[in-house]
Amino acid sequence: MALTKAEMSEYLFDKLGLSKRDAKELVELFFEEIRRALENGEQVKLSGFGNFDLRDKNQRPGRNPKTGEDIPITARRVVTFRPGQKLKSRVENAAPKEE
């Protein structure tokens, strides 16, 4: 199961007493600010959680898996996430979830 933005909004509604509309807007604005910073080439550091970084990848050779034809993979910029130490240790120490 995955945590969704709708579930985050519901949690803010339940725990902080925000209206559903305000909770949804808060979640949207939070992620929009992260997107804006990354679009502007900035690193995003969330203390106790982790860092979103931008990496430039060079063009490299690739292969079409259906035809086997060699094709170039174009140079591009990608977003990477590096979890912080607090997040890493919480995940490592969490009890495995039974399915």
UniProtKB/Swiss-Prot annotation:
NCBIfam families: himA (TIGR00987), PRK00285.1 (NF001401). This is Integration host factor subunit alpha. GO terms for biological process: DNA recombination; positive regulation of metabolic process; regulation of DNA-templated transcription; regulation of translation. Residues 49-75 are annotated as: Disordered. Coiled coil: none annotated. The keyword Acyltransferase does not apply. SMART domains: BHL. It comes from Salmonella arizonae (strain ATCC BAA-731 / CDC346-86 / RSK2980). Heterodimer of an alpha and a beta chain. HAMAP family: IHF_alpha (MF_00380). GO terms for cellular component: cytosol. The gene is ihfA. Belongs to the bacterial histone-like protein family.
